[in-house]
Design a protein with these regions (language model features):
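Solvent-exposed strand-to-loop "edge" motifs in beta-rich extracellular domains
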Residues: 43-46, 107-113, 122-123, 137, ...
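Short surface loop/edge beta-strand patches of beta-sandwich-type extracellular domains
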Residues: 22-32, 79-102, 162-170
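C-terminal motif of bacterial Sec signal peptides marking the signal peptidase cleavage site
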Residues: 9-13
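Glycan-recognition/cleft segments
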Residues: 120-153
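Extracytoplasmic low-complexity segments
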Residues: 14-81
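Short, solvent-exposed beta-strand-to-loop segments that form ligand-recognition rims
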Residues: 194-198
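Short, aromatic/His-centered strand-loop micro-motif at the edge of beta-sheets
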Residues: 150-178
Length: 198
């Protein structure tokens, strides 16, 4: 299983489990906050609530587990059938360029994966793939991770969809690694940083 501070933002309307009715989310105001930290999940005391400025409504799907030896306190421990779901504000659903620059950063400690894992997604309610998706693919390496990032609705009209691949050394093992996926809204490019180095 993956022991990490990973989370996934998924659109709840993609599925409906009749044993677990749909979440009762309030409507988004449609206004983009001006503060830089939109979402923050520190997982203190096994708390999955968002401490960022947007106050995403976060729910546990699959009985979330936590590890006590996180980089600073508790860490979310993902599993095949357990993930965190945060309701995406309507402002983010179908128009990626309006948010400008975006950084998704987290600490991760995991062993080598044997199948693809979804790490993060800003969904798109019109298309199959989301506006911004991060996947950890199987790379057949004991230490090097293979990330695939999907970007949709970029600024270049002739190329509305793009996949970016990044192979990053020294990810798997017993040490915590800080990863940052930085999206530049002006150029529609992604840069991946490992422990601050690109």
């Amino acid at each position: 299983s993956v022991a990490s501070c990973l989370f996934a933002l998924c659109m709840q309307s993609c599925f409906q489990d009749m044993d677990h009715p749909a979440f009762d989310y309030p409507e988004s105001t449609g206004e983009v906050p001006t503060t830089p930290l939109k979402m923050y999940l520190p997982f203190d005391e096994e708390d999955i609530r968002d401490k960022g400025e947007w106050g995403f409504l976060v729910a546990d799907n699959g009985n979330a587990k936590f590890a006590e030896d996180g980089i600073a306190g508790m860490a979310y421990q993902g599993a095949e059938n357990a993930y965190i779901l945060a309701k995406t504000p309507s402002i983010l659903e179908n128009n990626m360029p309006t948010i400008g620059d975006l950084t998704v950063a987290f600490w991760m400690r995991t062993t080598k994966n044997t199948s693809a894992q979804g790490l993060f997604s800003i969904p798109n309610s019109i298309k199959f793939w989301g506006n911004f998706d991060i996947f950890l693919e199987n790379n057949n390496s004991e230490t090097q991770a293979f990330f695939k990032v999907h970007i949709f609705n970029q600024t270049a009209k002739e190329n509305d969809e793009r996949w970016v691949e990044a192979k990053i050394d020294d990810i798997f093992g017993s040490e915590w690694v800080h990863l940052a996926f930085v999206y530049d809204g002006n150029t529609s490019t992604i840069t991946v940083y490992r422990n601050g180095e690109g």
